[in-house]
Amino acid sequence: MNFLLSKLLLGLIRFYQYCISPLIPPRCRYTPTCSQYAVEAVKKYGAFKGGRLAIKRIARCHPFGGHGHDPVP
């Protein structure tokens, strides 16, 4: 189950990276970008924990949040 959800999440993230992201200006305050962070988190921890880490990261990515290098733990 987790494997299938991971593949689904990775597919959705890749769709965003290749089809939607090129149409909007770069806004991510972190490196790696939030979408790349999500890919790495899901690959490393699976759909549930990786997805939770990705959501927390995206929630921090705003003008009053942090910035700089923030790798997947």
UniProtKB/Swiss-Prot annotation:
Species whose genome carries this gene: Neisseria meningitidis serogroup B (strain ATCC BAA-335 / MC58)
Compartments, as annotated in UniProt: Cell inner membrane
Keyword tags: Cell inner membrane, Cell membrane, Membrane
Pfam families reported for this sequence: YidD
Function as written in the Swiss-Prot or TrEMBL entry: Could be involved in insertion of integral membrane proteins into the membrane.
HAMAP family listed in its UniProt record: UPF0161_YidD
Any one GO CC term of the record: plasma membrane
Membrane topology field: Peripheral membrane protein
Protein family according to the UniProt entry: Belongs to the UPF0161 family.
Protein origin, superkingdom: Bacteria
Main location, first listed in the record: membrane
Protein name, UniProt field: Putative membrane protein insertion efficiency factor
Lineage: Bacteria, Pseudomonadati, Pseudomonadota, Betaproteobacteria, Neisseriales
